Amino acid sequence: MDYPAQRDFVKELAVTCRKAGLGLFIYYSVGIDWHHPYFLPNTMYDPARPHYKEVPESYRFRNVEDFKHYLNYAKTQIMELCTQYGPIAGIWFDTVGGVYQYSELFNIQEIYDMIHQIQPHALVVFKTGANGNEDFITGEREMGSLAPVFKSVGLPKKVQDAADFSWESNNEKPAELNIPIQALGWAYHTSSRQRQKS
């Protein structure tokens, strides 16, 4: 283990889920990685990186070919999740905007195929869909294409069209709606307006 905690939290979660008779469903952020040196820069996809005054030296992305380093890293992690923790119920991918904009770089179907080859029973989901081949869909606060959201923040028409296509391909599949219990949205907030700490 090459991380500070020196614990395998996924293993602990997998063991606990098995003991409780629950399936292990893993969240994986393939569409944004603020730490990997070869992830897309925010000049290519605005939310891809924080807006630093100066780009950290650790960010090494220089051209599109560099992205293969990130993708190999992500595939290796996903393969590890599918092979090291016993049966998994599924993987929920996030965030989808960059995948829509650079579908040829992400090649998400290859990742889906790898998961289904290793864990044939595992469900794969990516919001309301990254390519229309998801096993079910998840909406965030509401169901529908993400195209209006992407249009409102000025993302290219290609992204909006991909969002519409994925929604149309998936909208009759089983669905799950995700709603934060916090007024301020997802994750921990220190604001006095925040009562729940989820």
What are these regions (language model features)?
Residues 1-198:
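Mature catalytic domains of secreted/periplasmic carbohydrate-active enzymes
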